[in-house]
Amino acid sequence: MYLELFAILLATALAWDYMRKRRHNKMYAEAGIRGPKSYPLVGNAPLLINESPKTIFDMQFRLIAEFGKNIKTQMLGESGFMTADSKMIEAIMSSQQTIQKNNLYSLLVNWLGDGLLISQGKKWFRRRKIITPAFHFKILEDFVEVFDQQSATMVQKLYDRADGKTVINMFPVACLCAMDIIAETAMGVKINAQLQPQFTYVQSVTTASAMLAERFMNPLQRLDFTMKLFYPKLLDKLNDAVKNMHDFTNSVITERRELLQKAIADGGDADAALLNDVGQKRRMALLDVLLKSTIDGAPLSNDDIREEVDTFMFEGHDTTTSSIAFTCYLLARHPEVQARVFQEVRDVIGDDKSAPVTMKLLGELKYLECVIKESLRLFPSVPIIGRYISQDTVLDGKLIPADSNVIILIYHAQRDPDYFPDPEKFIPDRFSMERKGEISPFAYTPFSAGPRNCIGQKFAMLEMKSTISKMVRHFELLPLGEEVQPVLNVILRSTTGINCGLKPRVY
C-alpha cells in the first residue's frame, strides 16, 4: 500500500517537474545557452556534492570553459542561467525588465526589510529618488571629515601590533572602522565601534553579518523553517541581534524626528533641526534626508526610514570592509605598487602624518584610485548579483523564458582574458587615464551598473581612498600571513583571513 502510494507520488512529481521545465529547456536550447546535465527534481544539485564555498569559484570557471559564458542552471525548483558575458551583463543591467532581485537576497529581509537593496517597482523607484540627494557633492565633502577621523583612530589602534612580524587580519580591523564611518554618516551618531567593540549594537551588526554569511553557504540554513528545525539556537541568536539593531535604529530615528518636530514647532524649519546646542550647523546624515522627505505629501514612517538606514549600515560597512582589506593585502604583496602609492600620497598630502585630508586632496590621488579599482577587479566586494526575469525577455538577442533566475558572475567576468590581458595579475595601470576607454564598461562592474547601480559608489571610493592613504602614510604593509582563499558569499570574504604585517614608517 505505502509502496504504491510512494510510486504514485513520485510519478506525479516527475511528471510535474518535466512539464514545468520543458518550456524552459526548449527556449534555452533555442537561445544557444547550454549547461551541465540536469536530473529530475534535483536539477544540477549533484554538481555541488564535492564542492565547498572555497571551491565554487573554480567550479564556475570550469563550467565557463565547457559551456561558454552563459550557462543554463536548474537547481531544485528553480531554472535560469549564470553569466560572465559582458554583453549579456550589459543587457541585463541596462533593462528595466530585469531590475527585480531574485531570492538570493531573501536572507536579508529580516534585517533590512524592504529597503533599497531589496525593494522592487514603484517603491524602489521612489526611494531611490529620495535617497539620491544624500550623496550630493556638498554632503560628501562633509563626510570626508568623518572618513579622516575614523581612519585616524584605526591607525592609532594598529600601532600596538605594528612590529613587522605580527600577522594582522585586516578584515575585522577595517570592519570596525567602516562601521564607525557608516553609523556617523547614515545616522549621525558615534557608536565608537573601534574603541568599544563590545557595545551591543556593534556586536549585533557583527553577529548578524557573520551569520548571514554562514546561512548563504549552508543549504540547511537557507530557510527559516529548516533553521528552526536544525539550528534553533542560532536562529534565536540571529533574531536577538536583529532586534537589538532595530531597537537602536528606532531610538535614533525617534530622537531625531522629535528634534525636527520641535524645531518646526518653535517657528523654525527643517534646517533648524540641524543646529547644535551652540547654533552651529551639524553635519547632515542620510537619516536627516529621509526625515525631511515625503512621498505623495506624506512623510516616511519610522519603519520606512529604518529599512533604509539598516540597508546602508549593511551595504556601507561590509562592502567597503572587503575592499579595504583586499587592497591592503595586495599592496603588501606588491611593494613596487605600494611605493608608488606612498610617493603619490606624500606628494599630494605632504609629510605631516596628522594632516587631515580633504575631498580635493583625495581627488588628486589618481594612482591610488587605479589601485583600488584593480583590487576591486580581482576581488569585487559583491562577487555575484542575482536578478529575476518575470516575463519572456529578449537579452543580447536571446529570448529568455519567464520565471528565470539569473546569477551575474562579477568575479568571473572581471577575470575574462578577452577584456583583461593577464587577468590574474595585479596591474593598476589598467585603469590609468592613458588607457581610459580600453575597458568595456560592462566587463568591469564592481558597483553594478544601469538603473540598479550602487547609489553610494562615490561615497565608497572616497572612504576607501581616505582609509588606505592613511594606512600607507603611517605603515609599510608587509606580506605576512596566509594567502587569501576567496569564498563565494553575498560579500566576498576569505577563509584564511585577509592578512598582512605592518611596520611604522619613519620619514
UniProtKB/Swiss-Prot annotation:
Keywords: Endoplasmic reticulum, Heme, Iron, Membrane, Metal-binding, Microsome, Monooxygenase, Oxidoreductase. InterPro entries: Cyt_P450, Cyt_P450_CS, Cyt_P450_E_grp-I, Cyt_P450_sf, Cytochrome_P450_Monoox. It holds the Pfam family p450. Signal peptide: none annotated. Its cofactor is heme. Heme binds at residues 315, 454. It comes from the Eukaryota. It is a peripheral membrane protein. GO terms for molecular function: heme binding; iron ion binding; monooxygenase activity; oxidoreductase activity, acting on paired donors, with incorporation or reduction of molecular oxygen. Disulfide bonds: none annotated. It is an enzyme of class 1 (oxidoreductase). It is found in: Endoplasmic reticulum membrane; Microsome membrane. Its EC number is 1.14.-.-. One of its GO terms (cellular component) is endoplasmic reticulum membrane. Belongs to the cytochrome P450 family. May be involved in the metabolism of insect hormones and in the breakdown of synthetic insecticides. This is Probable cytochrome P450 4d14.
